[in-house]
Amino acid sequence: MLSRGGSAVDAAVAMMLVSCAAETIFTGLGGGGFATVYDAATTQVRCLDFFVSVPGLGGKLPSPATSIEVIFIGQHVPYEIGPATVAVPGIPAGAHYLWQRWGRLPWATVTAPGREASYGTPFPAMHAQVLPRVAAAMCVGEGIEVYQRSDGSYLQAGDPLRHPDHHRAYELMLRDPRAFYHGAYADALVVAVSNGGALSQEDLDAYHVIESTPRSVRVNDFTVHARGNDLDDLLGTMERVAPVVAGDPTTDARSAAALIDALRAPTKRAETTNIVAVDDHGNGCAITTSLGLGSGVWVPGYGVHLNSMLGEGELIRGLVHPGVRMGSMMSPLIALDDHGQLAAIAGAAGGSRIRPALVQVVLRMLRGAAPQEAIDAPRLAALPDLVRLEPGFFSQVIRSLESDGYKTAIADHRDPYFGGVSALSPLGAGADPRRSGFVIML
């Protein structure tokens, strides 16, 4: 997209649509997301909310959901799937809104890579490692054909990932993205969730993208912008962490302890995908999307797996009402210097590890590290009763933490559990090997 003269948003939307076909254990057209966009000409930052909304405007009440368990880093974590967990998807509306607002290239050009990917892509090795953990949600209904071989075993690295009829959804995206909310596709979606779900045509009619001014905080000599109403208060955490984490947590025990205390949060699992792009004019766009764990409900004839956001316990904090947006940890961010120029753009995937991953990576970047260096550095995740650390923390740091009463567990290797970050700065680009990330520099 960029080599054709496209904008950062053209590139980011194209990548998002590809990810919805090629990374379908993490995201898809049946999910939702957020975007943060920087306009270099005006030095303004805008946030877009195209996350899922709570269904029920048609008056239908959901039936009980189906309870499952997934094993994540040795822990059995309860979730719910089924029609009752499906919220109103936002990705089709969000993709088109972004392009209409900031795109340069024809819509057909922007959607073409996604349409090509919808016919099948090689299954990534990291996804093959994750699939057995989430099979209880993925290998249901049409997902059996998608994610399992003919002998019943799970897809392996390099196997073709193909959703039958998925190309029909991408052809619809090309012709008219609004058709995901009205007409034959919408009818099929409503029927798919009708046995227990609350989603109706009234919910689809009411869905709209929300554009807003971001919240901002000062971190060192930079202003960091993000949507500001994420469930884990990313910006507030960054503002608190920067003054107390003076050194490198991998080598300095005091900095490690301060980081842990600021990041204490419960562990839950949610899958997300993140994308960042910067164009030749200096404009930037970061997008984070998610399917949740996946509901096991598919839109027949279109190959679209629907989200399970209403079954994600960590997203339900208090009462939820029909028509309102659900909360999320996703929070793509942009940091500007004192001249309003782009200093860093980043986002992360990983549910409740989004905040710790972004805080650790962006803090390193704002202190002079190149994006890939910051992403490759070992990370920690601070749970209420345990600190999980990646390999690479100095042994004296670990001993000091344990002597101060922190219970620690060292991972065998870098793991998707610790989040997947993608980032750009004037020093280059970085993508996370923990989640098979990659960089394209033009």
What are these model-derived regions, one by one?
Residues 3-4, 8-175, 180-182, 187-224:
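Noncatalytic scaffold domains of N-terminal-nucleophile
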Residues 21-25, 34-47, 283-344, 355, ...:
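Active-site rim segments in enzyme catalytic domains, especially the processed small/beta chain
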Residues 25-26, 85, 158, 205, ...:
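Short Gly/Pro-enriched turn/cap motifs at secondary-structure boundaries
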Residues 27, 31-39, 215, 273-278, ...:
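Short beta-strand scaffold segments in enzyme catalytic cores
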Residues 47-101, 223-248, 326-381:
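N-terminal accessory/precursor segments of enzymes
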Residues 209, 251-269, 279-280, 312, ...:
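C-terminal catalytic domains of large/alpha subunits in multi-subunit enzymes
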Residues 211, 269-272, 328-330:
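Short, small/polar residue-rich loop motifs at catalytic or cofactor-binding pockets
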Residues 222, 228, 233-290, 302, ...:
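Internal maturation/activation junctions in enzymes
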